[in-house]
From Swiss-Prot:
Location relative to the cell: Cytoplasm
Chief subcellular location: cytoplasm
Keywords linked to the UniProt accession: Cytoplasm, GTP-binding, Hydrolase, Metal-binding, Nucleotide-binding, Ribosome biogenesis, RNA-binding, rRNA-binding, Zinc
Organism: Klebsiella pneumoniae (strain 342)
Protein name, UniProt field: Small ribosomal subunit biogenesis GTPase RsgA
Name of the gene: rsgA
């Protein structure tokens, strides 16, 4: 994926924030090594400011401080940590995270002040949850798929609430989902209420670290609670409510949970919705995987893939090689990006002067 470009004002803010953090860190004393035991391997299951909950090999969870030399630590990181000892006055000393292993993958989101911000690590797949209610939106599904391709993390499309469909509705929705099956995406149709289709979903989640993405109202929390086997008293409460747009942020901490059937999930409202405004137009184009065979074959090198003469993509649409809905959503995404980028430039205009 090509490097995301920031405006001069955004870059100045990123650098200023980083220098401020370094100055604050330098003024603080580091932790006394004598307060901690031997090093162990662990995984970060949640991050709270300057502390992290680390799960050890035996499954126990330890609240840890974070060495000031560690610049980035997120849920899912594999770490080296040391347990705290009891100090002489009987006050329990927290553990400490000493180092972070190299990440197999990192999930990021655009941030107005810090550029592209990591929010979860070592994710194997993003479960894109949609539903027939409040409405089945292929445009939203396509936006999530573009985000997955940009992050280079495999997506799994899960369509929830199929119990609300009659036979004709089910047939229509299956035809819509065939668009994605035919270009290589995995699609599962489930109902968190009746638990139809949950067994195949459990199999797809086993031995993997997953994260659920989807708009409010599609039943993400209901699915997670069913998969985690939680009762009403244990139900996950950090779902996003009254949020309809991509790219919304939240301060609720991400947390890693273990599925009883195997596999893990990182649950966080902050990573369930993705913004695309930080991506280049070429990245959006590349995010439509069925376009790849036709890119570079247009009559003109600067083809915008719209009404340009000799456009290979439009010809593929006309010949039924590319779904018309996907091609239309591609242009909708580009248009929405332009609108958001204009607003972003206005927000930072005072800083650029």
């Amino acid at each position: 994926m090509s490097k995301n470009k920031l405006s001069k004002g955004q870059q100045r803010r990123v650098n200023a924030n980083h220098q401020r953090r370094l100055k604050t860190t330098a003024e603080k004393a580091d932790y006394d090594d004598n307060l901690f035991g031997e090093t162990s391997e662990g995984i970060v299951i949640s991050r709270f400011g300057m502390h992290a909950d680390v799960e050890s090999a035996d499954g126990s969870v330890h609240r840890c401080n974070i060495r000031r030399t560690i610049r980035s630590l997120v849920t899912g990181d594999r770490v080296v940590w040391r347990p705290g000892k009891d100090a002489a006055d009987g006050v329990n000393v927290k553990g400490i995270v000493e180092a972070v292993h190299e990440r197999a993958s990192v999930l990021t989101r655009p941030d107005f002040y810090d550029g592209v911000k990591p929010i979860a690590a070592n994710i194997d797949q993003i479960v894109v949850v949609s539903a027939i209610l409040p409405e089945l939106s292929l445009n939203i599904i396509d936006r999530y798929l573009v985000a997955c391709e940009a992050q280079d993390i495999e997506p799994l499309i899960v369509l929830n609430k199929i119990d609300l469909l009659d036979d004709d509705g089910l047939r229509f929705v299956n035809e819509q989902m065939d668009i994605y099956r035919n270009i290589g995406y995995r699609v599962l149709m489930v109902s968190s209420r009746t638990q139809d289709g949950l067994k195949p979903l459990e199999a797809a989640l086993t031995d993997r670290i997953s994260i659920f993405a989807g708009q409010s109202g599609v039943g993400k929390s209901s699915l997670l609670n069913a998969l985690l086997g939680l009762n009403e008293d244990q139900i996950l409460t950090n779902d996003v409510s009254d949020v309809s747009g991509l790219g919304q942020h939240t301060t609720t901490a991400a947390r890693l949970y273990h599925f009883p059937h195997g596999g893990d999930v990182i649950d966080s409202p902050g990573v369930r919705e993705f913004g695309l405004w930080h991506l280049e137009a070429e990245q959006i184009t590349h995010g439509f995987v069925e376009f790849h065979d036709y890119l570079g074959h247009c009559k003109y090198r600067d083809c915008k893939h719209d009404n340009d003469p000799g456009c290979a993509l439009r010809e593929a649409v006309e010949n039924g090689k590319i779904a018309e809905s996907r091609f239309e959503n591609y242009h909708r995404i580009l248009e929405s990006m332009e609108q958001v980028q204009v607003k972003t430039r206005k927000n930072f205009s005072s800083s650029d002067d």
